[in-house]
């Protein structure tokens, strides 16, 4: 996959759009099929650059993921508001995976209170999201609780191939495999 948290920048710390677009398209032209971004990446500009890179038939070649900035959500309606804003920035009618970003105990409580399941059902029914998911940044016990809270299609964990003990990556990966996620 191609993560879009960090792109080359210009001296004034803006994304070097032409270089970022060249990199994304080069990756796709050479077999990369997964593009990952999120609302806060590059101060909200990453999604805009990706939208430009995925023009001219490139969108149809990839699985596109972006993330709901859970820490900014205050109401149930905010979830759809952020999704619509992100779809506009990405210049696409849908994302393949829309994931709750950086879930932890506090954020999971908030999402449950605001009925994230209804949001996902609505977004999927409207054709804006294909699959729900979450990214996770907390301990293994809560990880199990989040997994049990819904019928998830997708999960991103922090994983370092050189240190499988970091963030309980080995245990989390084994659990995800056992659940076919």
Where are these regions (language model features)?
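Active-site mouth loops of central-metabolism enzymes
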Residues: 5-18, 67-77, 108-109
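Structural motif corresponding to the early beta-alpha repeats
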Residues: 41, 57-77, 101-102
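Short, acidic/polar
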Residues: 13-27, 74-91, 137-147
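Beta/alpha (TIM)-barrel catalytic core signal, keyed to glycine-rich beta->alpha loops juxtaposed to Asp/Glu
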Residues: 103-181
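N-terminal binding-site loop/beta-alpha segment at the start of enzyme catalytic domains
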Residues: 1-62, 93, 119
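Structural preference for beta-strand elements that scaffold enzyme active sites
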Residues: 1, 33-34, 61-67, 94-99, ...
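Acidic (Asp/Glu)-rich catalytic clusters
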Residues: 29, 51-61, 84-93, 124, ...
């Amino acid at each position: 996959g191609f993560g879009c948290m960090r792109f080359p920048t210009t001296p004034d710390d803006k994304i070097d759009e032409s270089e970022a677009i060249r990199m994304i398209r080069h990756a796709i032209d050479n077999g990369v099929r997964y593009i990952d971004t999120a609302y806060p990446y590059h101060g909200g500009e990453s999604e805009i650059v990706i939208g430009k890179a995925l023009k001219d038939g490139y969108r149809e070649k990839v699985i596109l993921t972006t993330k709901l900035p859970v820490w900014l959500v205050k109401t149930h309606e905010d979830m759809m508001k952020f999704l619509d804003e992100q779809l506009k920035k990405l210049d696409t009618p849908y994302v393949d995976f829309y994931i709750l970003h950086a879930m932890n105990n506090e954020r999971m409580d908030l999402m449950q209170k605001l009925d994230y399941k209804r949001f996902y059902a609505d977004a999927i029914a409207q054709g804006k999201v294909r699959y729900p998911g979450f990214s996770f940044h907390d301990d293994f016990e809560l990880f199990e609780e989040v997994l049990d809270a819904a019928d998830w299609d997708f999960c991103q964990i922090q994983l370092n191939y050189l240190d499988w003990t970091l963030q309980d990556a080995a245990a989390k990966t084994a659990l995800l495999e056992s659940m076919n996620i």
